[in-house]
Amino acid sequence: WNLCASTWGFFMPYIFENVGKLSNSVSQLMSVGSFVISFLATFFIFMQLGDRMSRRLLYGIIGGIYVIAWFVWTLPADMLSMWMLVMFVVFAGINNGSGQQAFYQLWCSELFPTKYRATAQGLTFFITRILAAIWGFSVPMIMESFGFRYAAMLIVAFAAISWLVGTIGAPKTEGKTLKQIEIERYGHEVK
């Protein structure tokens, strides 16, 4: 998911304008719209449902729509229509507010013992940021050599892998205290 997020952060205005054929102002509106949707999704989906329903199911639904969102960009550019681009913005915005990033941070907080939590989170963030930077440098070369649709197919593959790993491997931690989770995972409290 972080490779997809890296693409969004570095290249979405370019993609909206050059692949989606939007004006610069509409491209910027799409980015702002996605941010607003992310904000709303964080409050109305993640904060309201994250502790009340199966997190695996919630993650599965949100991760699935994220794969669908990026799939739009694998279509030939002449097939893209405004409703598809708006759907991409809405689906990606929902994910960005209540999908992989939110669950990743939640699970990092829950699954690592307090004693090791900062180190573990720091290491995982370090690795993902390095990979995202490498991917960010690679995207223009991939687009130049193979075209944007190929890059989009890779992004869909990354989103699908993240979706499957999170959906299949999601821990059942909802409604449990950190102490309960720690004892379940390690057999005792980690001192």
Model region roles, listed by residue range:
Residues 16-17, 48-50, 139-147:
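Interfacial helix-cap and linker-helix signal at transmembrane-aqueous boundaries
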Residues 41-54:
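Helix-to-loop junctions at the C-terminal end of transmembrane segments
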Residues 51-63:
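Cytoplasmic membrane-interface "Motif A"-like loop-to-helix N-cap segments
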Residues 1-39, 136:
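Extracytoplasmic gate region of multi-pass secondary transporters
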Residues 64-79:
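C-terminal ends and interior cores of transmembrane alpha-helices
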Residues 24-25, 114-124:
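Loop-to-transmembrane helix entry/capping segments in MFS-fold secondary transporters
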Residues 98-112:
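Intracellular juxtamembrane helix-capping segments at the cytosolic ends
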Residues 83-99:
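Hydrophobic core of transmembrane alpha-helices in multi-pass small-molecule transporters
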